Amino acid sequence: MKDNNPVVKYIDTISYRGDDRRRPENSPRVPCMVPVTVDDESPNKEPYYGKVMNIGHGGCKLFTHELVNQSALLKITFYLQRGEDFHKCTPITGRVVHVHRKGSNYVANVDFRGAIHYEHGIQELIDLNSK
C-alpha cells in the first residue's frame, strides 16, 4: 500500500475521486472459490453458472464455460454457504475488462459498478477468505 495514496472507503470524503475503490493498491484481491450466476441480460441466453476465483471491493475474476464479451455489463449473483445450504445474495452489476480462454473455459476480469452494499455479499466473502 502506498503511503501517498491511502485507502478511501467512503464517498463523502474530500479526497474521493470516484475510481479509488478500483485501484489495485487500495483493493487487493482475496483468493476464493465461490459459485455465482451470471446474467448478461441477453434475450437469447439464460443466466449461467460460474465460479469466482478471487474477489475485492473493486471487482473479481470470473471462471465460466460461456464466452463473455469484453466491455459487456453483467449481473453477478454470489452464493454464500450457510451451514449445508447456499444463500443467494443481491445481484451486483459489473463490466468485463478482460477475457481470456483457458482450455475450453473462459476467465474474465470484472470491475464492479455502483455502490457496494452488504446485501451483495462481497464484504462477507472477503472476510471469510482473508483469514
Identify the residue ranges that each predicted region occupies.
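N-terminal helix initiation/capping motif
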Residues: 1-55, 127-131
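Short, solvent-exposed secondary-structure boundary/capping segments
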Residues: 61-64, 102-113
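Short, Lys/Arg- and Gly-enriched loop/turn segments at beta-strand edges
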Residues: 81-91
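Short, conserved beta-turn/loop elements at beta-strand boundaries and strand-helix junctions
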Residues: 41-43, 57-58, 99-104
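A short macromolecule-binding patch
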Residues: 117-126
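Short coil-to-beta transition motif at edge beta-strands of beta-rich domains
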Residues: 30-36, 68-81
